[in-house]
Amino acid sequence: MKEAKIENIDFGNALSERYLAYALSTIMSRSLPDVRDGLKPVHRRLLYAMLQLRLEPNSGYKKCARVVGDVIGKYHPHGDVAVYDTLVRLAQHFSLRYPLIDGQGNFGSIDGDNAAAMRYTESRMTEICMLLMEDIDKDTVDFRSTYDDSDLEPVIMPASFPNLLANGSEGIAVGMATNIPPHNLHELCDALLYLIDNPQAGINDIMNFIKGPDFPTGGIIIDKAEVINAAYTTGRGSFRVRSRWEKEELSYGTYQIVVTEIPYQIQKSKLIEQIAILLKDKKIPLISSIRDESTDIIRVVIEPRDRSCDPQIVMESLFKLTNLESRIQLNMNVIGSNNVPRVMNILEILQEFLVHRKNIIIRRSTYLLNKIKQRLEILKVLRIVYLNLDEIIEIIREEDEPKTIIMERFKISAIQVEVILNTRLRSLQKLEEHAIIDEHSNLQKQQAILEKILKNHKELWQIVKKEIKAVQTKFGLNTIIGARRTSFEEVDLTNQVVDITAFITKEPITIICSKMGWVRSLKGHNTDLSTIKYKEGDTEKFIIEAYTTDKILIISSKGRFFTLLADNISKGKGTGGVSIKLLVDIGNNDITNILVYKPNQLLLLASSIGKGFLVNSNEVIAQTKTGKQIMNIPEGYSCIACLPVNGDSIACIGESRRLLVFNIDEIPEMKKGQGVVLQRFKNAKLLDIKIFNKQDGLSWNDGTKIQLEKNIVAFLGKRGGFGTFPPIGFPKNNRFSP
């Protein structure tokens, strides 16, 4: 037995080479579409397999299992699930703007329901799909061997329509991704026709025809025109898409809101579930219920809390909190005609498509021209046969080598003789001279046209235009499938601030947060704290008086701010309440302070490293549960204070037991960061700060009573100083309060 050859190689080099091969495989053979036909290899192989099975629009359906079997057996040696999922998506009217497959059976729903098993469903190609493979049998594209060299598959499709932009594409490769939304085919054809007539046109000229994406699920794009144009110019950007809704009047002056279209790629069932959860958690007090009345069309009914609610405000609150408004990404990363992936702008994609179509027509014309020349040679032979039929028959019957005799007698080629010898006698007898002459004349006319196309650049582009116009006529705005579904509406998002608190009854409450992080609210102010019960080993930490309409600021020890609506805090005198971790994503961090939000209020932030800064309260409002990072805290330190600025001076004291007092004007106002040095230390940390008015003196609580120091001259200094020893009687824990 021959011994295996073992080669020693560097592991790092081997790993990098194999990873590079894998990365290139995912980019070129799996995840990114080709700019010319807009297809990935799995799409191309699937559609070509269906063409081979003759699953044309006017033919019968075949089981999807049969189609998938042919694809994975002949062209695509991967799992059947991946191929079937691809087939299903190409048939879903809510996934593709122009479906390429006509499915029969359960192909899933916009609710996220899965399609039936492939043994139950059937499919065939759509008319627009046939345009992708039109003239594929006329040598218009190159073919290559399949994975096992048993068959051939097309490298690219002829693509008579711009499928990449019409249906869009998405995929994630190694180190790159693509996300191209669908567009309206009529508008794309207009842009292509203009580009043929005006080769020097720019993106701004093209954008006069292409308004923006056209999603299969409709919706409303609310971005401004300049934002949309900027995205198409760079090939990267995003679009904000809102659901389409209408107000339905009911009896007694009541109404309900009906959502008829939702953003692209949003599952309706999950959207309704999202709204229902927010409704249960009292995050959207403007509505009372939501229900799904959808059939073949989307109909989601939202009932307002009462008829006094403005439907526009109701919807603005839902747009802000739910996927009724969604952001669709644009990343036009595709494989170019040179097989190099890159991000293209919309003009480059259209130009690549036009060049592709020009090459297809050149190859098709060349192929047809060669076929015509071959047929003309045959017709020439047939006319000779017609005029000399008896002589030819006699030569065939009498001579041992009729081929040579016929070639010499009639001065024709060996190929032409083969045509004569391979023609049946019955066919020879039926020859008619006028039919041969007519066909010869017609073919010569066609030959002249094709030669003119190949020689004349303008004629070639006229054919491209003619075919694009034919596609536009068949799938234009006047057709059911071609009518634009997504509309545009500029919305000034800066003015779309929904004050939900306006719909909450204003009532006084007392918010209590324990040391263990349990928070609750009690009705009224001046609450008898002795009646409040806590969990075993727990006690109060923060007690603040607020109103149900207030926003509550929660500051963590890591400098992150969280915002809660006071009305959403659990109510009741029972032990505990609700853990703060269920309301905000504070993690295992401690709570530094809890404050009632007041607009444009200055807050002083300080960390144990001795730094701090002023921040406007408007800058710390967090819109999500994850909060907003305001103060950057180094590892090993924490945010020790967040205080409203209600004085002209600040007192700082740390582990070094040095007290420093300086004017609060020395501290800068910032939006976020670490801040500036408040008090300097050597191997110590800042423990506490206090804001006060200099004329009132500095006070502190020693645990028994409030102490006051009127003469603070000895402790005055500049920001960033070390400070001096505090007054006699200052607490030994170096804090202004116990």
UniProtKB/Swiss-Prot annotation:
Tree of life domain: Bacteria
GO cellular component terms, semicolon-separated: chromosome; cytoplasm; DNA topoisomerase type II (double strand cut, ATP-hydrolyzing) complex; extrinsic component of plasma membrane
UniProt-listed CDD domains: TOP4c (cd00187)
Site (Transition state stabilizer) location in chain: 119
UniProtKB keywords: Cell membrane, DNA-binding, Isomerase, Membrane, Topoisomerase
Predominant cellular place of this UniProt entry's protein: membrane
One GO biological process term: chromosome segregation
Membrane topology: Peripheral membrane protein
EC id: 5.6.2.2
Record-annotated disulphide pairs: none
Enzyme class: isomerase
UniProt subcellular location: Cell membrane
Topo IIA-type catalytic domain mapped to chain residues: 32-496
Catalytic activity line of the entry: ATP-dependent breakage, passage and rejoining of double-stranded DNA
Catalytic center residues: 120
GO MF terms held by the record: ATP binding; DNA binding; DNA topoisomerase type II (double strand cut, ATP-hydrolyzing) activity
Subunit structure: Heterotetramer composed of ParC and ParE.
Protein family according to the UniProt entry: Belongs to the type II topoisomerase GyrA/ParC subunit family. ParC type 1 subfamily.
Described purpose of this protein according to its UniProt entry: Topoisomerase IV is essential for chromosome segregation. It relaxes supercoiled DNA. Performs the decatenation events required during the replication of a circular DNA molecule.
The protein's name in its UniProt record: DNA topoisomerase 4 subunit A
Taxonomic source organism: Rickettsia prowazekii (strain Madrid E)
